[in-house]
């Protein structure tokens, strides 16, 4: 599916390629990727290309000379008013003023489907995100991962992919053993027994709360069980409670998963064992000091890794390899993991293991997410005033609301550290970016209430002369609306939701400027109708963009 700006861009790109062939700079079968996009400076036109600079090596001429020759052969589309050569050899395209009014009937005809793409048609993608240990509560870093993963899944769905959201439950291994022992210790303490708390146990208040809930439900029912059996029984109940708490926190944050995948199930089904056996058969395992080692160095890694300890217990790495094998065996074309930046060393290890198993490691994409810091009153907030421990996602949402939290978490690139300004997120002013965007939508709905009071209805688009929209404020808003599908494509291909957050903030800015300088009601009839249709097109895009972010579009503020 191609939209107005994409069609124009495609037409110009084709014309540039043909000009390069006619000028002898390219052979007809040559493939050359060149940029043709909106320049950063408005003075440089509507689209700019670096094609001339990419042809210097083959043409053996300077880029400005190449650009001049290209212009001699260029078929200029009707929408283009003029073409200029700038700087070292950029070719800038300036469109006629009225080209962009055609975006209004396009948006109105597509409605909520405006911006939907087919770049992912027929492809299945899995996005695995958060996957926090179920031994504690979700913190702010998990919140950033939740917003990033959920919004990215929304964007990929809009780009035509079939998307599955997945949470990997780390319910096996040493951490669960320590968790079980911690719950048992707190349980026994609450029942009046003196116990030594496990050295590597979990000390959080939430573990005491969990143990208290178990005592309230079951009393001393587990006291007389053998120690190991008691630990497992208590741990199982506690883990289920923790998992339900995590699910509730995420649902409150607007995140719902398609699959909750248990690490324990990989061990119980024998998948870990089968994966280890397959690596052995493919010649990538060897025995040393009684343990089984993965010969990762054969495939370029710095060192080999233990997969099965000498006591016969598989490592976490072995389970993780089995999990990723399972993902690809489920038929996903692309597997996306969202991990904290502290996992960066694990990325190449996982890709190497997939290669050893015979899978294409390029089908695994790992997004590494940087840390979040919370600020209030200009100072770093390290601990919750309420609990004296780390600040949970629930506490943050209670403080600023879902809308602000989700927006703030994705308004910076995932690979940049995020300083979350608590005061700004709560502010009801134009300084708060999410408020600023939502206020644009609320202003539109307020205008519609005025229309309703005055008996004004939305006119059929074919009855309105849209060319009357010619002021700078109107044209800037129209151009930005035309860029919406391009932004979705950019977000989907770069796996970068922050572009959508930025786009909506800019769109709100263009709308507020238009609203403050162009009256919609009480002006000449055709102008009023044209502006009303522009407002409706803006409403559709604003509402859809906010929905993709999982942020509400209020009717009143």
UniProtKB/Swiss-Prot annotation:
Transmembrane segments: none
Reactions it catalyzes: tRNA(Arg) + L-arginine + ATP = L-arginyl-tRNA(Arg) + AMP + diphosphate
This protein's name: Arginine--tRNA ligase
Keyword Transmembrane belongs to the record: no
UniProt organism field: Carboxydothermus hydrogenoformans (strain ATCC BAA-161 / DSM 6008 / Z-2901)
EC code: 6.1.1.19
Enzyme class: ligase
Predominant cellular place of this UniProt entry's protein: cytoplasm
């Amino acid at each position: 599916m191609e939209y107005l700006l994409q069609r124009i861009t495609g037409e110009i790109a084709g014309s540039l390629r043909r000009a390069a062939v006619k000028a002898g700079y390219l052979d007809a079968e040559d493939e050359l990727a060149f940029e043709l996009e909106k320049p950063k400076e408005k003075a440089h036109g509507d689209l700019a290309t670096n094609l001339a600079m990419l042809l210097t090596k083959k043409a053996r001429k300077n880029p400005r000379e190449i650009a001049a020759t290209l212009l001699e052969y260029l078929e200029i589309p009707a929408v283009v008013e003029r073409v200029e050569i700038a700087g070292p050899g950029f070719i800038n395209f300036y469109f006629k003023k009225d080209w962009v009014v055609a975006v209004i009937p396009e948006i109105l005809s597509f409605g909520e489907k405006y911006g939907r793409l087919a770049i992912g048609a027929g492809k299945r993608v899995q996005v695995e995100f958060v996957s926090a240990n179920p031994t504690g509560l979700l913190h702010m870093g998990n919140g950033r991962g939740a917003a990033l993963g959920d919004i990215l899944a929304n964007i990929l769905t809009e780009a035509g992919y079939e998307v599955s959201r997945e949470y990997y439950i780390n319910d096996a291994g040493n951490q669960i053993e320590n968790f079980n022992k911690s719950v048992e210790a707190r349980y026994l303490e609450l029942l009046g027994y003196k116990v030594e708390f496990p050295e590597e146990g979990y000390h959080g208040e939430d573990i005491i709360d969990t143990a208290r809930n178990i005592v309230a439900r079951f009393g001393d029912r587990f006291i007389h069980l053998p120690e190991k059996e008691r630990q497992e029984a208590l741990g199982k109940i506690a883990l289920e409670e923790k998992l339900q708490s995590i699910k509730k926190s995420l649902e409150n944050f607007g995140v719902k998963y398609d699959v909750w995948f248990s690490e324990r199930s990989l061990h119980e089904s024998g998948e870990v064992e089968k994966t280890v056996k397959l690596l052995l058969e493919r010649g990538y395992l060897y025995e040393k000091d009684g343990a089984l080692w993965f010969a990762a160095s054969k495939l370029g890694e710095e060192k080999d890794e233990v997969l099965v300890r000498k006591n016969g217990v598989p490592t976490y790495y072995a389970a993780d390899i089995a999990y990723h094998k399972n993902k690809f065996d489920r038929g996903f074309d692309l597997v996306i993991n969202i991990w904290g930046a502290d996992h960066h060393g694990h990325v190449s290890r996982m890709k190497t293991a997939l290669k050893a198993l015979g899978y294409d490691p390029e089908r695994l994409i790992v997004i590494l997410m940087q840390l979040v810091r919370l600020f209030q009153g200009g100072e770093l907030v390290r601990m919750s005033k309420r609990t004296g421990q780390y600040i949970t996602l629930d506490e943050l949402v209670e403080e600023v609301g879902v809308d602000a939290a989700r927006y703030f978490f994705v308004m910076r690139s995932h690979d940049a550290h995020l300083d979350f300004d608590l005061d700004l997120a709560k502010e009801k002013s134009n300084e708060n970016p999410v408020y600023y965007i939502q206020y644009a939508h609320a202003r539109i709905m307020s205008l519609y209430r005025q229309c309703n009071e005055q008996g004004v209805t939305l006119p059929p688009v074919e009855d309105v002369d849209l060319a009357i929209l010619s002021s700078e404020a109107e044209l800037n808003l129209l151009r930005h609306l035309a860029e919406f599908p391009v932004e979705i494509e950019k977000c989907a291909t770069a796996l970068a939701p922050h572009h959508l957050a930025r786009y909506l903030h800019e769109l709100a800015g263009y709308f507020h400027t238009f609203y403050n300088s162009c009256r919609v009601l009480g002006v000449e009839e055709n102008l009023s109708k044209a502006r009303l249709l522009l407002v409706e097109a803006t409403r559709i895009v604003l509402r859809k963009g906010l929905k993709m972010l999982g942020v509400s579009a209020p009717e009143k503020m």
